[in-house]
Regions:
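Catalytic cores of DNA base-excision repair glycosylases
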Residues: 3-236
Length: 241
């Protein structure tokens, strides 16, 4: 019986090539500036992209700049982002985050991140209340910074756990560290593409409640499928978030 699936023993480029056959090539969308990406990713925590993008668009249409958001009443911010999960909490934390950035650096921008190593940049971002590894990494990798950081969201984490690449209870930070160690030859764009491929796999095939193991291009190297079978993976899906 297979007892572990170690990405370090497998060429991640080969994994990406397999997923490229299953899914269309990920288009490189127009990048947001770092602060705008930060706000968008902040809103997107535990919220589908389509909903968080709508909330982000409403903020952009209502306010001229992020200074205006920082100075706006929390109730007004919350009303615009009410569709996202934990909207009241996010409204307060987003306002606080923008004000903290302005107080620390004199203005609301992330210019200082350009000269920092990725680890230092992640650390600085994660000092902001409400910011975890996913939001910090997305700010760096998805924005015009194009930083070499891998974004682990709920769908990606679920796939990595099921594969056995990380433990069943591994944190986002642990999954990030494991991927970055195994993908030491990947540049920022490679990590960007891998994220969206694994996210697509998690949403369309390795779904939370109804995993479609038979159609998964990576099923032969999936620890949970090998050990439990496709039926058990489907039944256990709700427990492996």
């Amino acid at each position: 019986m297979q007892t572990a699936f170690d990405f370090k023993q497998i060429d991640l480029r080969a994994i990406r090539d397999r997923l490229s056959i299953q899914f269309e090539k990920i288009p490189d969308r127009e990048r947001l500036d770092p602060v705008s990406q930060f706000v968008c990713s902040f809103l997107g925590s535990v919220t589908p992209d389509s909903i968080s993008w709508g909330a982000f668009a409403r903020l952009v249409m209502r306010y001229q700049n992020w200074d205006a958001v920082a100075d706006a009443p929390e109730a007004d911010i919350e009303a615009l982002i009410r569709s996202v999960a934990y909207s009241e909490k996010k409204a307060a934390e987003l306002k606080g985050a923008l004000r903290k950035i302005r107080a620390s650096y004199g203005k609301i921008n992330f210019d200082f991140l350009v000269d920092l190593e990725i680890g230092q940049a992640l650390f600085q971002l994660e000092q902001i209340q409400g910011v975890g590894r996913k939001t910090a990494a997305a700010t760096l990798n998805f924005s015009t910074l194009r930083g070499r950081a891998f974004v682990v969201d709920a769908s990606v984490l679920r796939v990595l756990r099921r594969f056995g690449f990380v433990g069943a209870n591994a944190s986002t930070e642990a999954a990030y560290d494991a991927v970055m160690a195994a993908a030491d030859d990947f540049d920022a764009d490679d990590l960007y593409e891998l994220h969206w491929q694994l996210k697509s796999l998690g949403q369309k095939t390795c779904a939370r409640v109804q995993a479609q193991c038979a159609s998964c291009p990576l099923s032969d190297i999936c620890l949970q499928r090998v050990e439990e079978g496709a039926i058990m993976v489907t039944q256990a899906s709700a427990c492996v978030a």
